[in-house]
Design a protein with these regions (language model features):
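Generic anion/oxyanion-binding catalytic loop in active/binding sites
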Residues: 69, 98, 147-150
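C-terminal extensions of enzymes
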Residues: 123, 131-171
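Alpha/beta enzyme core
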Residues: 1-96, 103-125, 158-161, 169
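Glycine-centered helix-coil hinge/cap
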Residues: 88, 130-131
Length: 171
């Protein structure tokens, strides 16, 4: 996480003896250089952090407010278009999480510039109730909803979204 969320006591968590605090640009560059895999920074919620991740060499970012754990934080879909514009023609991928519970939510994120979405809490209930089959049903339903909205708005595939399919009010 680019912005590790502290515990509810206002202090940073300690994981394996390391305090989880804010991540500097140099920290991020080090993480990217140490990894043999494409590095993804999660918890990006500002243009400044997106540009920091780009400068550090991250392959992708996840625009996220940790599902509401950051009180008063901007919603990921509100800041997503600003981040997309700031990154310009960068080949860094942009993913979004937080509240991606339906295919309609995924549609909005893709229309606003995301390359993909992450689904977490949306699959927990089906997983607990029906196991793997519940997750498969949920994901199939989300895909159907996404395809439905794409059909209604003339979007031929997820690579060809036209951001005018949504009315976005800039901040």
């Amino acid at each position: 996480d680019i912005d590790h969320v502290p515990g509810t006591n206002g202090k940073y968590d300690v994981v394996d003896g390391f305090p989880m605090g804010m991540v500097s640009l140099q920290d991020l560059k080090d993480y990217v250089s140490y990894s043999k895999l494409p590095f993804v920074a999660k918890g990006v919620l500002s243009v400044q952090d997106a540009l920091k991740a780009k400068e550090a060499g991250c392959a992708a970012i996840v625009v996220s407010h940790h599902h509401g754990r950051l009180p008063f934080a901007i919603a990921p879909l509100q800041v997503l278009p600003l981040i997309k514009d700031a990154l310009g023609d960068s080949d860094m991928k942009i993913f979004v999480d937080c509240g991606m519970d339906t295919g309609y939510d995924a549609y909005k994120a893709l229309a606003l510039g995301a390359d993909g979405v992450s689904v977490g809490r949306g699959i927990l209930s089906p997983l607990l109730k029906e196991g793997k089959d519940g997750v498969v049903k949920k994901m199939n339903k989300m895909n159907e909803e996404l395809q439905e909205m794409m059909m209604y708005t003339g979007v031929k595939d997820v690579k060809h979204f036209d951001k005018t399919v949504l009315h976005y009010l800039p901040l």
